[in-house]
């Protein structure tokens, strides 16, 4: 999904954070030329999943809750940057806050995601 939508994962700016960017183009915009809300959520959920997997290698991390507020539209041609910060790092739950901004640094979406951390099953 990340390749299909054009996500690019970036180096981590500080501990317990992760960052990615995505150019708004025909892969992730809706018919009016704006970034799709679904693509925005996919960016946030992929980023929080990558963050949880980095914190818990050898575990399975699955999203169990997503809450978002889209506060500003982004037109095709712009690039959005998502920065995820972990709010809670428990044994079985991670709570992430993701802020997505446009190239001017304006807030586009604020997303909160809860990931459930599972042990890998033994076969």
Name the predicted role of every residue range:
Residues 74-76, 81, 85-123:
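HotDog/MaoC-like acyl-thioester-processing domains
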Residues 22-24, 70, 117:
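Hydrophobic residues in beta-strands and at strand termini
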Residues 50-81, 86:
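Hydrophobic beta-strand-centered segment that forms part of the acyl-chain substrate-binding groove
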Residues 32-49, 53:
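Compact, glycine-rich, soluble single-domain proteins
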Residues 4-35:
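Catalytic strand-loop segment that frames the active site of acyl-thioester-processing enzymes
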Residues 3-5, 16-18, 37, 60-66, ...:
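A generic structural signal for short beta-strands and their flanking turns/coil linkers
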